[in-house]
Amino acid sequence: MEQQKFPNPRIFEDIDATDFSKHNKKHVTEDFVAENFKDVGWRVYRPFNDTGIDLIAKKFVCPDGHTKWNQNLTKEMTCSECGKSLIEITRFIQVKTREVKQVKTREAKGEKFFFGYTLKSKDFRTDPRHVFLLYSDFTMDFIILPMYDYLNLFYTNQSLGSTHFSTPSFRQGNNKLNGLSKDKNDNWVWSGVSFNEFVNEKGMDKLSCPIYDIELESYTKKIQELKFSLFYRYSPGRKNQVSAPTVEFINNHFSIFISLPKEAIASKRKAHLESLRQDLPEDLKKSVNEGYLVKFKGVDL
């Protein structure tokens, strides 16, 4: 029997995803992702409010990892291999869809493509069940990146982490990332680092692993530590003229700040918030209060 192809490019039999333009591509892509997940046993929902999560997926799996990524166990209560009761796992999926563009370089010779996507600091939830899913109908690949795996990959490869998280565009601007590419041998790479373990069936294997639900608190703390290591570094980027001593001073300040006790950090944040309340012009306060992060975190200037 031929191995199941995932994702199924013909999940909608009467229409092709490439028939849609960029103006409605996002919604079509989310439907395409949802139907492919349903096809392998996930129950998929859409959040009532748009908080940066596009889909919520749930599935029953064996707590010891015996459930295959494409198994549908909606009618079973126990694992057929070990007899343990199944547990329900949850994934909060953020879908990123882009047109995959051909790299126009002499070296590529028309045989390499890059996937440009945008991620901002607010997208990085401190929850191991949060997942980035990158998809383009040009390659028909799902690149499935659970939060912990994504951060750990860039932490392990420090040069990638600095390029990704330390530049000003990560905190302001659109932070468009164009490092991920696919070569003529169907390998997804970022500056020589392979992303193949996150693609299609392999990515679904990672997504279906129950460890993030079973050890939720432990992996939440690990993500916090990774974010401290990756986010609290400063790099001026290519366009900003900042001296090396200034960069060193800023990074030393970050190091001191994140090593403080939680109470001291909370006190500094409270003082900073109070200064914003007193010093910001009223029109800017209004803009901040209506912004995404402040709105959903309940802060009011």
From Swiss-Prot:
Biotech relevance: Could be used to screen carcinogenic mutations in a restriction endonuclease-mediated selective PCR (or REMS-PCR) assay. In particular, could be used to detect the vast majority of mutations that occur at codons 12 or 13 of the Ras oncogenes that encode glycine (codons GGN) at those positions.
E.C. number(s) listed in UniProt: 3.1.21.4
Thermal dependence of catalysis: Is one of the thermostable restriction enzymes that remain active after 20 to 30 cycles of thermal PCR cycling.
Reported impact of residue 62 to K: Loss of activity
UniProt keywords, alphabetically: Endonuclease, Hydrolase, Metal-binding, Nuclease, Restriction system, Zinc, Zinc-finger
Cofactor note: Binds 1 zinc ion per subunit.
Entry annotated with the keyword Nuclease: yes
GO BP field: DNA restriction-modification system
A GO MF term: zinc ion binding
Zinc fingers typed CHC2-type, residue spans: 62-82
Cofactor(s), by name: Zn(2+)
Catalytic activity: Endonucleolytic cleavage of DNA to give specific double-stranded fragments with terminal 5'-phosphates
Subunit details: Heterotetramer of two alpha and two beta subunits. The alpha subunit is believed to be responsible for DNA recognition, while the beta subunit is thought to mediate cleavage.
Official protein name in the record: Type II restriction enzyme BslI subunit beta
Gene that produces this protein: bslIRbeta
